[in-house]
Structures are given as C-alpha cells and as structure tokens.
Amino acid sequence: METTVSLVQMLDARERRVQHQQELLARYHKPLICFTMNICGPVKDSPLIRRGFARGRQLLRQQFLRAKLTPLYQDAVREVTGCEAFYVLDADPLTIKKFTTDIEDATPLGRLFDMDVIRPDGLKVDREELNLEGRRCLICGGPAKVCSSRRIHTVAELQEKTTEILTEARDAQDIADAARLAVRALLYEVTTTPKPGLVDRRNSGSHKDMDVFTFMDSAAALYPYFEACARTGRETAEQPAPETFAALRPLGCEAEGEMLDATGGVNTHKGAVFSVGIVCAALGRLDRSLWAEAARVLAEVSAMTAGLTEKDFAGVTAENAATVGQKLYIRYGITGVRGQVEAGLPTVLNIGLPVLEEGLAKGYDFDRVGGGALLAILANSTDTNIIARSSRERQLALTEELKALLVQTPYPDKDALAALDDRFIAENLSPGGSADLLALTWLLHFVTTEGNIDE
C-alpha cells in the first residue's frame, strides 16, 4: 500500500539529508553526489519509483566504471519520503557534474533524477557552469522552473506523466534484460567444452553442417525474437497465461526463418526458439521481483502451456504419425519438450540448476560445471535426439551408464568429457534436447542471480 507524506515529513527528510551531506563533506573533504527522485505529489515511494531509482544507481555505476572511479563512500536509504543515495568521489566536481547531467538528459527517465553534485565547501555545482540549459518540463518540454513557478500543469497531470515514464523505462529494461540473458545462455551452452556429441569449441560433435560460429550467428539473430517474446509477455500479463503462449506462435515461425537465414539453412536453435522463447515470455509476464525465484518463473511457463501436449498430439495415431516426436509419443508415450514445458521444466529446476549452482559454489570453471550439468540432465531425462539417432534401448542404457558415472564423479574433468565426446561421435549420438535444457539452465541461473536490480 502506498503511503502519503506530509509537508512536515518532507522538510524533516530534507534536514536529515543536508545533515548527512555535511557529515560526509567534513569526513572526506571530497565532492559528493546526492541522488534523489523528482516525484510530484504526496506519494514519494512505491515499487515503481524504487525501480526507477535502482536504474539511476545502475547508470551512475556505469559512469563510475567509464571514468575509472571508485566511490570513497556510498550508501542508499529508502523512506516513505523517497529514495536517497550518496556517493563521495575523488574527482573534479565539474567532471562529476558532466556525467550526472549526461544521465539526467539522456532519456525521459533521467528527467525524474535529481543528481546534485556538491563541492567540498558545500556549494552545489550548477548546470550553467557547464553551459547547459536548465531542466526541462516533463510534460511540455519547456523550462521546468517556469512551468513549476506558474503551476502550468496540475499535480494529476504530472503524476500521470511520471507513472508513464517509470512504467515505460521499467518495461524496456526488463524486456531487454530477458533477451540479453537468453542470448547469453545460448552462447554459454555452445561454448561449454567438451560436450559429448555436441558442437563446442573442441569440434562439431556428431554434426557435419555446423560449428561453434554457426551457433553464434544463430544466437545473435535471435535477440530480436527473445525481445519480442518478453514484450508479448509484458503486454499480455493481465490476460490468462495460455493467451500469451498463443501469441508466441507466429513469432516463433518468424524466428525460425531468421535462424535459417543466419545459418544458411542449418537448424541450430529450433528447440531453443520454442523453449527459451516461452521462458522469455514468462519473464515478461512477471514482476521483476519474482525473477529471483526459479520455481515461480517455471510455474508461469507451466501455466502458459497448460494442455499443450494433449492438444498437439490430439488425433495422432500410429498410422498418421509423421514427425519423430509424434512417433515416439505413440510408441512410448514420450512427450518431449512439450511435456517438459507443460510440467514447468522439472529437469531444469530439479536437476540442471542445482548441479550447475553447486559446481559454481565449489569453484569449478564454467566448462566443468556446464559439462556436469549436461550429463546430469541427460542421465535424468529422455533425450529424443538420442533415440532418433540410435534407439530407445540405447538411450535407456546410456542414461544408466551416465548415472553410474555421476555417482563416482559428479563433475567429470576435461579428459573424461573429451573421452565421452569421442565415444558419442563414434556412435553418431548428439543429445540436442539436453543441450537445450542446459541453455535453459544457464538462463535460469542468470535470471535468478542477476535479475534483481533493486539493491
């Protein structure tokens, strides 16, 4: 519930803020940034406002990195009277003012940032010292001081515009981050080396028509698609979850075409177009605060695809089964990736992700961790690619063999993985379904560990 604040509360907060500034200046004798939000009206704190504030802090950190500056001191407070952050920097005040005004002027969201730069003597650095114009009005773009002094715009108008700016900035960041992490996951999957029978940096596995560069081309081509999936999720978030999934179908068809264009007709990521696209849409449907909960993200995947298996296999018989997936469903009841997403990707949640994160906690490198997660996934799921390239019997025997291996060595080293790779290639085996689940495992790892930007 949003809390309104009184004028007295705001004056008290301002007094405390000034006192804190004076304490920091007296302690460090260095310039100081005081960052607050320009929020009109009696509500100064909300989840949406905090998201905007977090984005502002992120942009400041990026400027510090660009300028090779490490704050001598930094802290942040969140009160009903608003968010505040303080940074003490050993740098020229005008240099600091230049990059804070760059942030303030770069985007509509920047208009809501108030990044004061205070000299060691306590005086603020003015924009005019950099020959910059004053701040612009949120609504009309005119001089903010003029509009404010004349009260040209009502509080309601300013609040509506503020909400619009904050919402658009939040959605744009969430959509871009979902797509970025999705592409990153695809790249981590293909570069994990060695991977038995799969394309990696060592070789092309059991494939003759693709290599690691083919996969990189494909992953890059899919970024706009993953953005579109996340955007669709956000735009349909208030609708029943299956409606979001239905809206993805035409996007997926278009993405397959982009993939084939990028690879010269090679199917590198058809499975990932389906499964990773669904996860991106699920992220779009969810508030960013829920990204840290893998089970919640995958529950959304399950809700979106409810009834998918029954619907897609309705009417399929032994006589008319045409695809590998249809034939395996009729003969063995294997539901493949449809069953995985409809169940909320249990192999990712219960096998891949725990193995990946435990390996990282042990300090193993990405190759060894990724290899261990891949084998655990392959040993605890039904990879239809393995069956298609051999038989159901070989797939079952392989899973038992891998389970025994993983009991002894949960994270096989490079030599052991390379030996497995050679064996898989000799048998023409390629666990492509497990590779897709490994990519999803990396994606969920990135989302849960890096998705929460609210410091």
Short names for language-model regions:
Residues 1-67, 78, 98, 102-171:
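Long, contiguous binding/interaction regions
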Residues 32-92, 210-237:
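Short, well-structured hydrophobic secondary-structure segments
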Residues 45-46, 93-100, 291-296:
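Short, conserved charged micro-motifs
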Residues 164-241, 245, 283-422, 449, ...:
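Phosphate-rich cofactor/ligand-interacting catalytic cores and adjacent structured alpha/beta frameworks
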Residues 228-284:
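Long, hydrophobic/aromatic-enriched structural stretches that serve as scaffold segments
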Residues 257-270, 361-362, 422-431:
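A short glycine/serine-rich beta->alpha loop
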Residues 275, 371-378, 437-444:
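Short, structured motif recognition centered on aromatic/hydrophobic residues
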Residues 426, 430-453:
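Short, amphipathic C-terminal "tail helix"
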